[in-house]
Protein backbone atom coordinates (compact mmCIF):
# COMPACT_ATOMS: atom_id res chain seq x y z
CA UNK A 1 0.00 0.00 0.00
CA UNK A 2 1.37 3.40 -1.00
CA UNK A 3 0.85 6.50 1.13
CA UNK A 4 0.63 9.10 -1.64
CA UNK A 5 0.66 12.81 -0.91
CA UNK A 6 2.30 12.70 2.51
CA UNK A 7 4.98 15.16 1.42
CA UNK A 8 7.69 12.74 2.51
CA UNK A 9 8.51 12.00 -1.13
CA UNK A 10 9.41 15.69 -1.53
CA UNK A 11 12.04 15.61 1.24
CA UNK A 12 15.73 15.74 0.42
CA UNK A 13 18.09 15.80 3.42
CA UNK A 14 21.53 15.03 4.82
CA UNK A 15 21.90 11.31 5.63
CA UNK A 16 23.11 11.80 9.21
CA UNK A 17 20.26 14.15 10.12
CA UNK A 18 17.83 11.82 8.37
CA UNK A 19 19.11 8.79 10.31
CA UNK A 20 18.65 10.65 13.60
CA UNK A 21 15.07 11.73 12.86
CA UNK A 22 14.02 8.39 11.39
CA UNK A 23 15.33 6.57 14.45
CA UNK A 24 13.42 8.96 16.73
CA UNK A 25 10.21 7.86 14.99
CA UNK A 26 10.97 4.15 15.33
CA UNK A 27 12.44 3.52 11.87
CA UNK A 28 15.52 1.33 11.49
CA UNK A 29 18.02 1.51 8.63
CA UNK A 30 20.31 -1.26 9.93
CA UNK A 31 22.12 -2.92 7.02
CA UNK A 32 19.45 -2.04 4.49
CA UNK A 33 21.53 0.20 2.28
CA UNK A 34 23.98 0.19 -0.56
CA UNK A 35 26.12 3.04 -1.80
CA UNK A 36 23.23 4.72 -3.60
CA UNK A 37 20.10 3.70 -1.67
CA UNK A 38 18.68 3.55 1.86
CA UNK A 39 15.65 1.81 3.30
CA UNK A 40 14.05 2.67 6.64
CA UNK A 41 11.56 0.25 8.21
CA UNK A 42 9.23 0.54 11.17
CA UNK A 43 7.92 -2.82 12.38
CA UNK A 44 4.38 -3.38 13.66
CA UNK A 45 3.65 -6.73 15.37
CA UNK A 46 -0.09 -7.31 15.67
CA UNK A 47 -2.51 -10.19 16.11
CA UNK A 48 -3.21 -9.94 12.36
CA UNK A 49 0.47 -10.40 11.51
CA UNK A 50 3.73 -8.52 11.15
CA UNK A 51 3.74 -5.36 9.06
CA UNK A 52 6.38 -2.88 7.95
CA UNK A 53 6.07 0.81 7.17
CA UNK A 54 8.92 1.41 4.71
CA UNK A 55 10.51 4.59 3.43
CA UNK A 56 13.20 4.26 0.78
CA UNK A 57 15.49 6.88 -0.64
CA UNK A 58 18.42 7.37 -2.97
CA UNK A 59 21.59 9.47 -2.84
CA UNK A 60 21.55 12.60 -4.98
CA UNK A 61 25.05 13.52 -3.76
CA UNK A 62 27.82 11.51 -2.09
CA UNK A 63 27.47 7.89 -1.06
CA UNK A 64 25.75 6.15 1.82
CA UNK A 65 28.77 4.02 2.80
CA UNK A 66 30.85 7.09 3.62
CA UNK A 67 27.95 8.55 5.66
CA UNK A 68 28.34 11.68 3.55
CA UNK A 69 25.28 11.71 1.34
CA UNK A 70 22.24 13.77 0.54
CA UNK A 71 19.14 11.56 0.31
CA UNK A 72 15.94 12.03 -1.70
CA UNK A 73 13.09 10.13 -0.02
CA UNK A 74 10.43 8.19 -1.92
CA UNK A 75 6.74 7.44 -1.35
CA UNK A 76 6.16 5.49 1.91
CA UNK A 77 4.88 1.91 1.62
CA UNK A 78 3.05 -0.43 3.99
CA UNK A 79 3.66 -4.15 3.63
CA UNK A 80 2.77 -7.44 5.27
CA UNK A 81 5.42 -9.99 6.16
CA UNK A 82 4.88 -13.58 5.03
CA UNK A 83 7.26 -16.11 6.54
CA UNK A 84 9.56 -17.32 4.94
CA UNK A 85 9.01 -15.35 1.73
CA UNK A 86 9.32 -11.75 2.87
CA UNK A 87 7.25 -8.58 2.74
CA UNK A 88 4.49 -7.96 0.19
CA UNK A 89 3.61 -4.34 -0.60
CA UNK A 90 0.99 -5.06 -3.28
CA UNK A 91 -2.29 -3.22 -3.63
CA UNK A 92 -4.13 -6.52 -3.06
CA UNK A 93 -2.97 -6.77 0.54
CA UNK A 94 -5.42 -6.07 3.35
CA UNK A 95 -4.31 -4.03 6.34
CA UNK A 96 -6.03 -3.44 9.70
CA UNK A 97 -7.65 0.01 9.84
CA UNK A 98 -5.88 0.74 13.13
CA UNK A 99 -2.54 0.07 11.41
CA UNK A 100 -3.36 2.41 8.53
CA UNK A 101 -4.36 5.16 10.97
CA UNK A 102 -1.24 4.62 13.08
CA UNK A 103 0.94 4.71 9.96
CA UNK A 104 -0.67 7.95 8.77
CA UNK A 105 -0.12 9.52 12.19
CA UNK A 106 3.52 8.39 12.23
CA UNK A 107 4.08 9.78 8.73
CA UNK A 108 2.53 13.14 9.69
CA UNK A 109 4.79 13.39 12.76
CA UNK A 110 7.78 12.36 10.69
CA UNK A 111 7.00 14.95 8.01
CA UNK A 112 6.87 17.65 10.67
CA UNK A 113 10.32 16.68 11.97
CA UNK A 114 11.74 16.41 8.46
CA UNK A 115 10.50 19.90 7.64
CA UNK A 116 12.65 21.25 10.46
CA UNK A 117 15.86 19.88 8.92
CA UNK A 118 14.96 20.79 5.35
CA UNK A 119 14.26 24.37 6.48
CA UNK A 120 17.85 24.53 7.79
CA UNK A 121 19.33 23.58 4.42
State each model region's role.
Residues 15-65, 79-84:
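Ser/Thr-rich, low-complexity intrinsically disordered terminal regions
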Residues 68-121:
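Intrinsically disordered, low-complexity regulatory regions enriched in serine/threonine/proline
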Residues 1-11:
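N-terminal "first-domain core" detector
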Residues 12-17, 105:
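N-terminal amphipathic/basic helix or basic patch
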